[in-house]
Amino acid sequence: MNYVNIVEKSKNFIELELVNDDHSLSNLIKEVLLSKKGVILASYGVEHPVLDPDTGRYISNPTIMLKTDEKTDAEKVLKEALKDIVDLCNKTLKEL
């Protein structure tokens, strides 16, 4: 089963669905995307969540939407943002 599904993709727009997640990762990705040059819109939406009986967490399938200007490739910006998040996690692990 995929954790990430591509809902829609073009040069300047990408929409992803994160399967069985909540606000945490979606909000982090959105915030990092908004700091990137060429980003016009970075947003996410979460339908009404349900309680996962196995974890006790409220989960849904949030969608992340990214729109960039004509000169900026949306997939490239998304990959840069995800790399920044991984780098931040690695830096935090080293400092612990």
From Swiss-Prot:
Pfam families: RNA_pol_L_2. It is found in: Cytoplasm. PROSITE patterns: RNA_POL_L_13KD (PS01154). It comes from the Archaea. It catalyses: RNA(n) + a ribonucleoside 5'-triphosphate = RNA(n+1) + diphosphate. DNA-dependent RNA polymerase (RNAP) catalyzes the transcription of DNA into RNA using the four ribonucleoside triphosphates as substrates. Its EC number is 2.7.7.6. The keyword Zinc-finger does not apply. Part of the RNA polymerase complex. This is DNA-directed RNA polymerase subunit Rpo11. GO terms for molecular function: DNA binding; DNA-directed RNA polymerase activity; protein dimerization activity. Keywords: Cytoplasm, DNA-directed RNA polymerase, Nucleotidyltransferase, Transcription, Transferase. GO terms for biological process: DNA-templated transcription. InterPro entries: RBP11-like, RBP11-like_dimer, RNA_pol_Rpb11_13-16kDa_CS, Rpo11-like. GO terms for cellular component: cytoplasm; DNA-directed RNA polymerase complex. It is an enzyme of class 2 (transferase). The keyword Transcription applies. Belongs to the archaeal Rpo11/eukaryotic RPB11/RPC19 RNA polymerase subunit family.
